[in-house]
């Protein structure tokens, strides 16, 4: 089975959203990521519309709060028919457990429980920021591994991490875990605000379960062609 290429819809209004989606083809063949920018501007109705149209949705809100609040937030999100959602691993094991419990409690009967992905270190975080601003003395790869192990032990279904860390995670955690990787840039594309990036081919070779790609698709002159090319390279 093909591993998904998830289109990051980092847009701020439904007009932009509809314009991009109209160029990507059959909704049943498209997996999209809705993050804070679109969700906070367009609201919960945009998720309902997308699911009704047949899109698979990764709702990326990166919950990070006390366990009870995250439980109730996850419980509400589970009612929306989404496929993936996220928490920050730095919120700790009890918060992750509460998020998973909330997703289970909120999922309607007969529906699949959304997969819970824990964000390790954002792909915009460099080694210098990790060391000098987060005051973490571990190398980036070791920090990500530590957070990923804790997330799996706490009930997460996978992690969000840079493709640069995936091979090490496979070796130390195993293959029964999702490794979803943003920071994907086809050869020749600008890094933009990402620090730890890789091409779709590299992500494939290192073992990413799914990749998240935004601007190289949404800003392309032909978004569908760009999407199909990236899917071909990744699979």
From Swiss-Prot:
Main EC class the enzyme belongs to: lyase
Name of this chain's protein: Orotidine 5'-phosphate decarboxylase
SMART domains: OMPdecase (SM00934)
Reactions it catalyzes: orotidine 5'-phosphate + H(+) = UMP + CO2
InterPro entries recorded: Aldolase_TIM, OMPdecase, OMPdecase_AS, OMPdecase_bac, OMPdeCOase_dom, RibuloseP-bd_barrel
Alphabetical list of SUPFAM superfamilies matching this protein: Ribulose-phoshate binding barrel
Keywords: Decarboxylase, Lyase, Pyrimidine biosynthesis
Entries under Pfam families matching the protein: OMPdecase
Annotated source species: Lactobacillus acidophilus (strain ATCC 700396 / NCK56 / N2 / NCFM)
Molecular function GO terms recorded: orotidine-5'-phosphate decarboxylase activity
Record carries keyword Lyase: yes
EC number of the protein: 4.1.1.23
Active-site residues per Swiss-Prot or TrEMBL entry: 62
Lineage summary: Bacteria, Bacillati, Bacillota, Bacilli, Lactobacillales
Pathway: Pyrimidine metabolism; UMP biosynthesis via de novo pathway; UMP from orotate: step 2/2
Binding annotation for substrate: 10, 33, 60-69, 123, 185, 194, 214-215
Family of this protein: Belongs to the OMP decarboxylase family. Type 1 subfamily.
GO terms for cellular component: cytosol
Subunit: Homodimer.
Alphabetized PROSITE patterns for the sequence: OMPDECASE
Any GO BP annotation: 'de novo' UMP biosynthetic process
Function: Catalyzes the decarboxylation of orotidine 5'-monophosphate (OMP) to uridine 5'-monophosphate (UMP).
């Amino acid at each position: 089975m093909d591993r998904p290429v998830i289109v990051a819809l980092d847009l701020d209004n439904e007009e932009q959203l509809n314009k991009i989606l109209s160029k990507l083809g059959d909704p049943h063949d498209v997996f999209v990521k809705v993050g804070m920018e679109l969700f906070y501007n367009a609201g919960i109705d945009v998720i309902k519309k997308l699911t009704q149209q047949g899109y698979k949705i990764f709702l990326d809100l990166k919950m990070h709060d006390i366990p009870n609040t995250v439980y109730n937030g996850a419980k509400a999100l589970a009612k929306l028919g989404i496929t993936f959602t996220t928490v920050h691993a730095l919120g700790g094991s009890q918060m992750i457990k509460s998020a998973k419990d909330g997703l289970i409690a909120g999922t309607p009967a007969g529906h699949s429980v959304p997969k819970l992905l824990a964000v390790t270190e954002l792909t915009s975080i460099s080694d210098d920021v990790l060391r000098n601003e987060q005051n973490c003395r571990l190398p980036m790869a070791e920090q990500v591994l530590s957070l990923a192990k804790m997330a799996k032990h706490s009930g997460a279904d996978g992690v969000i991490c840079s493709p640069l860390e995936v091979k090490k995670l496979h070796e130390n955690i195993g293959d029964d875990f999702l490794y979803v990787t943003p920071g994907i840039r086809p050869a020749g594309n600008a890094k933009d605000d990402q620090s730890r990036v890789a091409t779709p081919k590299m992500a494939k070779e290192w073992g990413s379960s799914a990749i998240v790609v935004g601007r190289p698709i949404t800003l392309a002159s032909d978004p569908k062609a760009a999407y199909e090319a990236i899917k071909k390279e990744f699979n």
